[in-house]
Design a protein with these regions (language model features):
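Helix-loop-helix
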Residues: 48-52, 147-161, 231-305, 309-310
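Hydrophobic alpha-helical transmembrane segments of ABC transporter permease domains
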Residues: 20, 28-32, 69, 117-165, ...
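An intracellular "coupling" helix at the cytosolic face of ABC transporter transmembrane type-1 domains
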Residues: 10-13, 77, 98-102, 118-127, ...
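ABC-type nucleotide-binding domain
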Residues: 326-463
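Juxtamembrane helix-loop junctions of ABC transporter transmembrane domains
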Residues: 1, 20-21, 25-37, 41, ...
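ABC transporter nucleotide-binding domain catalytic core, centered on the Walker B motif
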Residues: 201, 263, 394
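Transmembrane helix-loop-helix hairpins at lipid-water interfaces of multipass membrane proteins
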Residues: 9-72, 76, 149-154, 265, ...
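Short intracellular "coupling" helices and adjacent cytoplasmic loop segments at the cytosolic face
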Residues: 46-47, 82, 90-114, 118-120, ...
């Protein structure tokens, strides 16, 4: 929550102006039932056409002013929410870029993507709705009750009971559903994780003939999400019928008690209409407030998930030596009693071993699928930190060196080639920012990838 407030403080002006203009709009809205009441009692009651035109013009004026304030408030609220979402997303992306493979494996790529996109969108939507309604709805509810007491305090007593009953119903439904939304969000992560694992591991799944098992697992994950969404949806669906029932009972109470007072001459027909209009305003605003609280419950659940990522500290710090003394007799790379275990795994992927490579040597590492070849290479580039033992680069423990320095000295080619956004030339310049086209083509020839580029009409400009 403190983090969110920090983002809102960066745009404090628009954050304050949004609810302020909404309050002004609500103030004009509260006068509308009184104007309508006077039109009924005076204009229609006395057949005063001029008065009706005058009051009709006043209604139009109130509507135009209220609409202007509403549009202005929506603009400021949307601007504050978008700024907040943009800043939070940028900071989260920068924080995630500091993660090693260990943190990415621990949290899960699908979860990180979900929190970067869906969760921050939920927070952004929550901020937008909060700024628009968190002051307006309570102001209209209590303002309508106050205005009802100015019309007739006896008839307005039903407002107190109605608002109390509505508050109990809304509060009870929210108390039940808010924890459920957190479970739904967590289950969405499970479905995304299952989908991603199947897409990325499709070759292995087919190789071991595990399609049916994976289909059952996905069906289970999807079914659990469906059941949770249906369950919370059924409870939330009770909100509208219960609130409308309570409001209609309140209106019946007003008509019953007010009708008697009209017959006795204590109330006018216009005043009864005004009381009913105020009751309708309360209904609309309480439904809005309930929906706001539901949106906020989702937003807070998403904010908590985003904060969990911010709270996760990278295991590899971007600190260390960036220069070392090169010794002739020292191996360029050396593993000393090195072992590695993936997060959550029961067994070691790489058992303790010793290994050394001297400058100029060419060594191939062979092994079956899952034997640890890719893990071994990842440890060299320090994409992971070893579980035990040490890895030395030119006699210096890699943990004492800055990760950027290590990766600048080691060429790492992943098993699966990936092209990032931009042209082929932009991708090739990742290795050398000032590379010329001749140098790029020379590198493509060495990598035997020149044919792939030549097949494209745009050549290096292909996107």
């Amino acid at each position: 929550m403190k983090r969110l407030l920090g983002y809102l403080k960066e745009h404090l002006c628009v954050t304050i102006l949004a609810p302020l203009f909404k309050m002004l709009e609500a103030s004009f809205e509260l006068f509308v039932p009184l104007v309508v009441a006077s039109m009924i009692d005076v204009g229609i009651g006395h057949h005063d056409i001029g008065y009706l035109w005058k009051m009709g013009g006043l209604l139009i004026l109130l509507g135009i002013i209220g609409f202007s304030f509403s549009i202005t408030a929506q603009y400021f609220a949307a601007r504050s929410a978008v700024y907040t979402g943009k800043s939070m997303r940028s900071d989260l992306f920068a924080h995630m870029n500091q993660f090693s493979y260990q943190e990415i494996d621990q949290v899960g790529t699908s979860t990180l993507i979900n929190r970067m996109s869906n969760d921050i969108n939920q927070v952004q939507n929550g901020v937008n709705m909060f700024l628009r309604l968190f002051l307006r709805s309570p102001f209209v509810v209590f303002g309508a009750m106050f205005m009802a007491f100015t019309v007739d305090h006896k008839a307005a007593i039903s407002f107190v009971f109605t608002i109390t009953a509505l508050a109990v119903v809304v509060g009870l439904i929210l108390w039940i559903t808010m924890p459920m939304y957190k479970k739904v969000q967590k289950q969405v992560d499970g479905v995304l994780k299952s989908t991603r694992e199947n897409l990325l591991g499709i070759r292995v799944i087919r190789a071991f003939n595990r399609q049916r098992s994976e289909e059952e697992n996905f069906r289970l994950q999807s079914g659990q999400l469906y059941n949770k969404q249906i369950h919370v949806g059924k409870i939330s669906a009770l909100l509208n019928p219960l609130t409308y029932m309570i409001i209609n009972l309140g209106i019946i109470a007003i008509l019953w008690s007010g009708g008697k007072q009209v017959d006795l001459g204590y109330l006018t027909q216009g005043q009864i209409i005004a009381l009913i209009n105020y009751m309708s305003q309360i209904l609309v605003e309480l439904v809005k407030l309930a929906n706001l609280l539901i949106i906020l419950s989702r937003a807070f659940a998403s904010l908590d998930r985003v904060d969990q990522i911010f709270a996760l500290e990278p295991s590899m710090k971007e600190t260390g030596k960036t220069d070392i003394e090169e010794k002739k007799d020292t191996p360029i790379l050396e593993f000393k009693d090195t072992s590695f275990v993936y997060h959550g795994a029961r067994k070691e992927t790489i058992h303790p071993f010793d290994f050394a490579v001297k400058e100029g040597e060419t060594i191939g590492v062979i092994g079956g699928t899952g034997s640890g070849k890719s893990t071994f290479v990842s440890l060299i580039a320090r994409l992971y930190d070893v579980t035990s033992g040490r890895i030395l680069y030119r006699g210096v423990d890699e943990k004492e060196l800055k990760p950027e320095f290590i990766r600048g000295k080691i060429g790492f080619v992943p098993q699966k080639a990936s092209l990032f956004e931009g042209s082929l030339r932009d991708n090739m310049k990742w290795g050398k920012e000032d590379a010329t086209d001749e140098e790029i083509y020379q590198a493509l020839d060495i990598a035997q990838a020149r044919e792939f580029v030549d097949q494209k009409e745009q050549g290096l400009d292909f996107r």
